[in-house]
Amino acid sequence: MTHCTVPLRLQLTAAVAAAVSLAAASYAAEVNPAAMIYKTPDQFTWRDPTDKATTNNTVLYGDPNGTGLYIYINKFKPGRFGLPHYHPNDRFITVIDGAGWRGTGTVVDPEHAVRLPKGSFSIDHAQKVHWDGTKEENGAYLIAGYGPATNIEVPKGIGPYAGGDPTSLTLKTPDQIEWKNNAGNRTANLVGDPSKTGLYVQMLTWLKGDHFSRPHSHPNDRFIFVLSGTWWAGTGTTFDPANLAIPLKAGSFATHFAKQVHWDGARDEDAALLIIGEGPATNTPAEAGK
């Protein structure tokens, strides 16, 4: 019997080629646009494309000047504070980068502002005067609510600062957010109740270690922003994370369309998501192959 010995160098080359081919196949996965659409941060359209302005914004969904649900991002350069103002409707705000400083009342006093680092959540209550800004760090907010989200300025008060109005803002730093541990993930309901009718805002963290949901659908659209980590998402009834899931990095934004089948989760790192929608967000399992 003749034995053919393959040189170690060729064996290693073949192994590397196979690994690269496998990785390429995995990353070449696509999702069904009827079930899910997404944008990576480099695909966002900013008001100031040069990003030189002190403040900048991009609308992800809806129209803040209209009357329906809207979602947009405001970002700020360091060292700026706005004037006191209010909005006609509640606004729900997640700090997605840097840190914001927030206060209430007509006297803008940065020394009495509350620092909200990345991962914090706040509510601007309707008709209540508040102000915010940045100090040494930049800041970015993801803001959601029902429009119009008009910014109505009020005359700036003359000091001294008298304590503001505690009913104007609801503020939660990351350590104040209450989480519920589930199998493979943890959730925090920030606004509303996903099981009931009405607007809800929820944080969901998929835990690392190949934790995934199985194919399912929801009765209403859901809007997802990746806060940190890499989120893996797929569509259709075939559950195959190794070959059919796409990776969405932090800062990406996606829509899961109503009654369309999808699945998602995390691989080798936690994936933290912000989910916004109108309930109920019932999870309906899909039948394989249908």
Regions found by a protein language model. Give the residues of each.
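Bacterial N-terminal signal peptides that target proteins for export
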Residues: T2-A14
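Bacterial N-terminal signal peptides
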Residues: T13-A23
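A short, N-terminal "cap"/entry segment at the start of jelly-roll beta-barrel domains
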Residues: Y27-Y70, N151-Y200, A288-K290
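N-terminal post-signal-peptidase region of extra-cytosolic proteins
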Residues: N57-L60, I71-R80, D109, A188-N189, ...
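Glycine- and acidic-residue-biased ligand/ion/polar-headgroup-sensing regions
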Residues: K77-R80, H87-V107, K208-D210, S217-F239
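Short beta-strand His + acidic residue motifs that chelate non-heme Fe in jelly-roll/DSBH
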Residues: G82-P84, R102-G103, D124, V129-K135, ...
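Ligand-binding loop in jelly-roll beta-barrel domains
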Residues: A126-A149, P247-K249, A258-T282
